Amino acid sequence: MTEAVQNVAQPQIEVENLNLWYGEKQALKNISMQIPKNSVTALIGPSGCGKSTFIRCLNRMNDLIKNCRIEGKVSIEDEDIYEKGVDVVELRKRVGMVFQKPNPFPMSIYDNIAYGPRIHGANKKDLGGIVEFALRSAALWNETSDRLKSTALSLSGGQQQRLCIARTLAVKPEIILFDEPCSALDPISTSRIEELIMNLKKDYTIVIVTHNMQQAARVSDYTGFFLMGELIEFGKTRQIFHNPKEQSTEDYITGRFG
């Protein structure tokens, strides 16, 4: 049973009756959700509950998995992203993704950021401005402006994760998916990423998967609780954490299981 927010202000992503199977195993069951524009939506739940599988449906990353089958509808700005003829490369430009562990390319800081724009045909003379914009947006410019030609692998873990965020921003997405972006970081780096996420929602719609419920409470406007492939409850974060409608939501948030 799902308590979902209906008719939210400016839904940018609408998911209707989404089901997903890996071979014979069903991993997502009848998920419906509206994700508002220019907001942070956190997805919480125990390991293996379907959170990461769900966000990979939003940019069709699950297409890369053998024997993965999807039914249902996922719309972004009223466009069904699973319709025939959808340009998946363009979709993944619109819907960027930041992964659990920082994954900088083995090249310079500059080339890490310029890589995506080059692929998408950016003019060479514009690349410098794009790189600066992305690094400033990811709060990394002041720490890297004097060493753009240095290898990205020389950055600290927290800096590498902000570099990955900058790399995503460089191709001008509309939506950014974060899959446990702070799980490999220390508390100071985590705090910087959280502050960055809250700043980015002015210009982007953000969906974050996290096992850290305190993080979900700090950064998100909306929260969805997943359990065994089902969306149990979805609503404004304050309501989910202070007055959940489902007993299993309350049990998870209060640490009775997880």
Swiss-Prot record:
GO terms for biological process: phosphate ion transmembrane transport. SUPFAM superfamilies: P-loop containing nucleoside triphosphate hydrolases (SSF52540). It comes from the Archaea. Keywords: ATP-binding, Cell membrane, Membrane, Nucleotide-binding, Phosphate transport, Translocase, Transport. Coiled coil: none annotated. It is a peripheral membrane protein. The keyword Repeat does not apply. Its EC number is 7.3.2.1. It is an enzyme of class 7 (translocase). It is found in: Cell membrane. Pfam families: ABC_tran (PF00005). One of its GO terms (cellular component) is plasma membrane. One of its GO terms (molecular function) is ATP binding. Residues 13-253 form the ABC transporter domain. It catalyses: phosphate(out) + ATP + H2O = ADP + 2 phosphate(in) + H(+). ATP binds at residues 45-52. Part of the ABC transporter complex PstSACB involved in phosphate import. Responsible for energy coupling to the transport system. PANTHER family: ABC TRANSPORTER I FAMILY MEMBER 17. Belongs to the ABC transporter superfamily. Phosphate importer (TC 3.A.1.7) family. This is Phosphate import ATP-binding protein PstB. It comes from Methanosarcina acetivorans (strain ATCC 35395 / DSM 2834 / JCM 12185 / C2A). The gene is pstB.
